[in-house]
A protein has these predicted regions:
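Extracellular jelly-roll beta-sandwich "head" domains, especially the C-terminal globular C1q domain
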Residues: 1-134
Length: 134
């Protein structure tokens, strides 16, 4: 169902800055963070999501692939997601103290299993005190 994705199976949460109930990470330090996610949808179902930093979209994941404007006349079969399609991203973001990061599901349903099919991870690469002054 659309909304913020709560990654409730936490493998590591040093400092407790990720809230598994809300799905929101709050940056404890200003710096550069590496953020990654793999989103797995139900078979034959497109998954679309947005990585948000302090409620502003930063990156978009679309398991159906990129569709530029003007493709409305293509056959439906060409625009369907393939079985087992994934949405994946990995990026480095500058975060200030108190910035929040979350993944908001826009469309589709994520697969649930005992296996870790859908994951989110983040790590501070290095602290940057100049970001605190911005």
């Amino acid at each position: 169902e659309p909304g913020t994705v709560p990654f409730d199976r936490v493998l590591l949460n040093d400092g407790g800055y990720y809230d598994p109930e809300t799905g929101v990470f709050t940056a404890p330090l200003a710096g550069r963070y590496l953020l990654s996610a793999v989103l797995t949808g139900h078979r034959h179902e497109k998954v679309e999501a947005v990585l948000s930093r302090s409620n502003l979209g930063v990156a978009r994941i679309d398991s159906g692939g990129y569709e530029p404007e003007g493709l409305e006349n293509k056959p439906v079969a060409e625009s369907q997601p393939s079985p087992g399609a994934l949405g994946v991203f990995s990026l480095i973001l500058p975060l200030q103290v108190g910035d929040t990061v979350c993944i908001d599901l826009v469309m589709g349903q994520l697969a649930h299993s005992e296996e870790p099919l859908t994951i989110f991870s983040g790590a501070l690469l290095y602290e940057d005190t100049e970001l605190e002054q911005v």
